Amino acid sequence: MAQNLRVAMIGYGFMGKVHSHAWRSVNHFFPDAPQIEMTVICGRSKEALENARITFGWKESETDWKKVIARDDIDIVDVCTAGDSHEEIAISALKAGKHVICEKPLANNASEATAMAQAANEAAKKSTKSMVAFNYRRVPALAVAKQFIESGKLGTIYHVRANYLQDWIIDPEFPLVWRLDKKTAGSGALGDIAAHIIDASYFLTGSKITSVSGQLKTFIKERPLPGAYTGLTAGTSAGRGTVTVDDTAVFTANFDNGAIGTFEATRFAAGRKNAMSIEVNGSKGSIYFNFEDMNELLFHDHTHASSEAGFRKILATDGAQPYVAAWWPPGHIIGYEHTFTHEIYDFVVSIKNDTNPSPSFDDGLYVQKVLDAVESSAGNNSQLTQVK
């Protein structure tokens, strides 16, 4: 492996922006990480791409991702495109011997995700690494929650209760951006944000969902066609188009450890901007986390006397907690962007040490299988559907 890791990033939208920040900052705060060279950024619009290159700090820009993957001076390919291109780009990069980190969800369906996982496992035989970018695993408070559960503080797990609530498309005149097109995005709130809480439930408990009963709902059937894109949104142009994905997804789930779960993901929860929350209840206690208070974890110890019962707040800002020592003194909080720096750090250290990064493409495939099962259930009157 070269002393420095030379990175190519495909895509320069919202995720491209935050990934660029992570690549740019990782060496400043994690000195044991390999040195990163932000070599080339790739996208379709030459003018917008060049602006992104300058703004985000990349050395070069290129409009043809196939040329990027063919280059000998690229070690890592970071896939930040829409879901419909993940399979082709990631598999091509892995076959070319490039390490790959790919945004979530891994693909638009389980068939595509299966092909990606197979390619990743084959590439791993040559120490070529791959990881799916579920950044919430890198929130220090959730990492602490995982430690609590693994140490037995919660006892036998009975319930997982997870929500991801947003309101950014509640305006019926919000444009028909690519996230509202099934061909491009695969699904709506289900794949975009429910994927996060499905992965979080697995990350925390170590248990997988085996069956689901779900409902999907699209509240706004038509929207103005989009104009030029800016981050998550876009301007509007003449005409209207059909929304082909869900606005909200709700499902119950059975886990392989005997626990039961409830999951809700919506972009229509007025007043909720990015309220990703998860609660786990066990025989000895409970944890609760809400990303809108991302530096805090609530913990209830049910082994205490009832006169002392109740949730207590744990500040995840102490240097002894995962990732925190790299940043600021205790009590100085971190934010959303730091979780991406943490995942980039873990990924490049796995390359350096020849270890297996997590979550793997197999983990991403598992999440995609759950998403597909929810869609299948919703299309069959919420019939209980096995995750296969």
Regions found by a protein language model. Give the residues of each.
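N-terminal Rossmann-like dinucleotide-binding module
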Residues: 1-56
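Predominantly a Rossmann-like dinucleotide-binding segment in NAD(P)-dependent oxidoreductases
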Residues: 126-128, 136-242, 297, 381
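Glycine- and charged-residue-rich phosphate/anionic-cofactor binding loop of Rossmann-like
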Residues: 35-39, 350-367
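Terminal low-complexity tails and localization/encapsulation signals of metabolic enzymes
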Residues: 1-8, 14, 324-333, 346-350, ...
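Beta-strand-loop-alpha-helix segment that lines the small-molecule cofactor/substrate pocket
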Residues: 75-76, 82-137, 152
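Conserved SAM-binding strand-loop segment of SAM-dependent methyltransferases
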Residues: 59-64
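Glycine-centered short loops/turns at secondary-structure junctions
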Residues: 97, 127, 152, 258, ...
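C-terminal glycine/acidic-rich active-site capping loop/insertion
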Residues: 217, 221-246, 250, 254-257, ...
